[in-house]
């Protein structure tokens, strides 16, 4: 189905599932993901300016998540790119990868960054 889109060799990383209670209780998932991504890019000497779009995947709402994608992009160093948030319960990461691939395949994007993060072990608790 996709002939132009691919994930380059060494162009990916994954972190272990985190327990958000205890030492990580006050961490913000988007900030943690963006800081980790920035280190990932720096270790490979890759410039975040190469990306033209950022797809943020996140299911559990947190403060600032409404504008989470451009915020995360700015934190990794891609300050002028747009983005979107995808929240698709139990399928968020797969949907992000698919949307990134389709965007490249159709020419909508040249080089899209898919960043998925969450606080799943804490469970959703939203107070209005």
Go through each PLM region and give its residues.
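Conserved "HGTGT" condensation-loop signature of ketosynthase/thiolase-family condensing enzymes
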Residues: 1-81, 117-128
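Conserved catalytic cysteine-centered active-site region
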Residues: 58-111
């Amino acid at each position: 189905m996709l002939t132009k889109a691919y994930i380059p060799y060494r162009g990916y990383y994954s972190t272990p599932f985190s327990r958000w209670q205890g030492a990580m209780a006050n961490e913000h998932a988007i900030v943690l993901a963006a800081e980790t991504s920035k280190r990932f890019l720096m270790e490979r000497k890759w410039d975040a300016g190469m990306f033209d779009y950022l797809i943020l995947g996140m299911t559990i709402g947190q403060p600032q998540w409404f504008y989470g994608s451009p915020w995360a992009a700015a934190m990794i160093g891609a300050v002028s790119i747009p983005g979107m948030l995808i929240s698709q319960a139990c399928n968020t990461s797969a949907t992000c990868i698919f949307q990134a691939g389709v965007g490249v395949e159709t020419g909508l994007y040249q080089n899209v960054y898919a960043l998925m993060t969450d606080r799943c072990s804490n469970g959703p608790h939203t107070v209005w």
